Amino acid sequence: MNKYVKESIFKVLMVISVFIVIAYLVMIVGINVVKGGIVLIKNPAVVVTAPGPKYLLGGEGGILHAILGSILMVVPSTCISCAASYLIALFLQVDYIKNKLSNKLRVVFDVLWGIPSIIYGIFILNILIITNRRGSLGAGIITLALLQMPVIVRYMDEALNSVPNGIRESAYSLGATRLETAIAATKYALPGIIAGILMGMGRAMGDAASVIFTSGAGNSMPKGLSKSAASLPVLIFQQANSFYPSVREHAYAASFVLIFI
C-alpha cells in the first residue's frame, strides 16, 4: 500500500476517534445540563431549599443539604491534603532524600492514585466499625483527604521537579536555608501546584464511592462533624432511579450543580 494512502487512512481514523470522544463528552454533559437546567428553570428554589419530611416520596424540598455537605467535606479535606501533600512533595526532592528512595516513594503514590476510590471508603469504614462509630461528616473529610493526597502529591512533586536547578543553586550560593530555597522553588512551581490542587478537589467533589460508606446519607442539613452528611454524588446515586419523577428531578438538578462546581 502506498505510504501516502496509509497516512491518509491514519488521519481519517484520528479525526473519527477525536469526533467520537468529543461527541461522547457533549452527550454526557449535554443531557445532564439540559435536564438539570429545565428543573432549575421550573423550580430555582431547589438549590436553596432544605428537604422536607416526605422528600424521598416526592414531597417538597430541595438539595441544599447535599450542596452544603459536599462543600463542608471537600473544602476541609482539600486543605488537609494540600498541607500534607506539600510537605511530602518537598521531602521527595533531592535536597532532602536520595534519588533511589524518592523514586520508590513516587511509585507508591502512583499506585495509590490508581486504587479505586471505593477502597478508600472501605478502609475508613473498617476503622469506623472497629471504633464503634457511625458514618459522619468527619469521616467523609478524612476519606476525601486520603483520596486526594496521591493526586496532589504527584502534581506538586512534578511541579517542584520542573524548577531549574539554577534557582536552587543560586539560593544556596546566597546563603539561603533549605526552607528559604523551598519557598523560592514553590513560587516558580505555583501554576503546577495549583493545577494539582484543582485536580484533587475535582476528584473529591465528584466521587460517590469513597463517601457512600463513610459520610452517611441523611436527608437533613449537616449538623456537626460527628453527624451524617449528604453529598451531591451520593444524592445523585440514590435518587436517579427513584420511582417518583420529582425525586429524579432532584438528581438532575444535583448533576447540573455538580458539573458547574
Which sequence ranges carry the predicted segments?
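Amphipathic cytosolic juxtamembrane alpha-helices at the membrane-cytosol interface
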Residues: 7, 97-103, 163-164, 168-195
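Membrane-embedded alpha-helices of multi-pass transport/permease systems
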Residues: 26-30, 83-90, 122, 135, ...
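Glycine/proline-centered hinge or cleavage motifs at structural transition points of membrane proteins
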Residues: 85, 116, 174-175
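Interhelical loop and adjacent transmembrane-helix boundary motif
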Residues: 211-259
